[in-house]
Structures are given as structure tokens and as C-alpha cells.
């Protein structure tokens, strides 16, 4: 939620603070007609991770949190995520991921 709140503030978008029992269906925001899913990681070497079945948004954004501060590491289009993904082996659901080196700078969103 911290990454979503920071993204909303950065782009002047309203943040949905109500937890929905079924989740947000993979879309956190609509920006210029494009659906956005913000993924937040606290890992020292963060990756943008999603289950294949949950890849629905037009754009994915990777936020990294440390000490209650948020840094946006970049974004990627859905098709590029699908084309460039790797699979986390040995993790339930075998989620897909891309490393932050594959992401576009947040300033170009």
C-alpha cells in the first residue's frame, strides 16, 4: 500500500484505501487511459513480480520501500513484461518477474 500511496501522490491520483476482499483485480490506477499496477518490494535486490494469471494491467510499476521511504525503480508495458519475463523457480505459483534493469525510468511514464 505504501508504494500505491506514493504513486498516487506523485501523479495526483486518488488512492483507494478500502481493502477489497477480492483484491483490486490487478489494477491500482488509471493514468491517461492506461491501467497501472504498482508492485512494491522491500527486498534488497527488488524485482517486479506477478503471477501469470494476475497480469492484466497495461503498465506495471516497481516501487522499493526502505525505512518508510519509497523509490520508484521504473515501469514496463504489459507486453514487454510478458516477452521479457523469467520464472521464479521453487516458488508457489511459479510467478513471473523482470529485474529493474529492464524497466523504463519513472520520469518517462
Regions found by a protein language model. Name each.
Residues 1-32, 39-109:
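Nucleic-acid endonuclease domains
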Amino acid at each position: 500500500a505504501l508504494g500505491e500511496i506514493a504513486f498516487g501522490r506523485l501523479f495526483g491520483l486518488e488512492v483507494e484505501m478500502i481493502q477489497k476482499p477480492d483484491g483490486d483485480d490487478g489494477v491500482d490506477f488509471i493514468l491517461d487511459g492506461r491501467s497501472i499496477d504498482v508492485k512494491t518490494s522491500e527486498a534488497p535486490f527488488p524485482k517486479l513480480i506477478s503471477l501469470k494469471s494476475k497480469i492484466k494491467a497495461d503498465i506495471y510499476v516497481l516501487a522499493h520501500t526502505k525505512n518508510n521511504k519509497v523509490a520508484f525503480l521504473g515501469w514496463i508495458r504489459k507486453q514487454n513484461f510478458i516477452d521479457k519475463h523469467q520464472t521464479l523457480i521453487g516458488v508457489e505459483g511459479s510467478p513471473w518477474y523482470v529485474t529493474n534493469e529492464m524497466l523504463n525510468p519513472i520520469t518517462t511514464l
